[in-house]
Amino acid sequence: MAASAQVTYTTAFHALHTLGQVQAGQWVVVLGGAGGVGMAAIDLARDAGARVVAAASTPEKLEACREVGAEVVVDYEHEDLKQAIKAATGGADLVIDPVGGRHSEAALRALRPGGRLIVVGFASGEVPSIPLNLVLVKGVSVHGLDLRQLHTVHPDLNAGTLPELLGRVAGGRLHPRIDRRFTLDQVVAALHCVADRQAIGKVVIDL
């Protein structure tokens, strides 16, 4: 597992398990499913026995989400995200959100009572404004996950996470996807690839 994939998988692991308390058979929605954290979340949710709805923005990205383990895919640029999630799940148990923007509220509205929204980033570049009355009326919870803070505040939680993940990769249970590799002199191109959200999976710079 490349060093960059370690970060995405550790983030997704704590979003799903530490905060999300995912259980087998539950419906997990992953926004930005073709991104680094998104792909890791799909892979880990599938490994936990959960059912996955993945949202992405192009046919190529949606197909990649299916290949990793998403049962349902949603093109959230052309479909009504809330309605698509509700139609597939009847109300999701858990949403993993590395994207932010306008899709966050739609996903929150698609949670079942008691569901959980885990915010792990704002890849869209837009921080969403979510009406807090939705949290109260729907009886859902919203959690934020910053891996750096987790390392600082709860170092004990991370002690066994990486060895566990590496063991699952070695055992064939997890399949990290590296989309593109760049050399150090191609770092500008690599940054553009990430900023323009072209990658499907993780981008790696070889030192």
Label every model-predicted segment.
Residues 29, 74, 93-96, 118:
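N-terminal Rossmann-like NAD(P) cofactor-binding module of classical short-chain dehydrogenase/reductase
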Residues 56, 102-171, 206-207:
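Glycine-rich phosphate-binding loop and adjacent beta-alpha segment
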Residues 80-90:
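Short amphipathic alpha-helix with an adjacent loop that forms part of the alpha/beta core around
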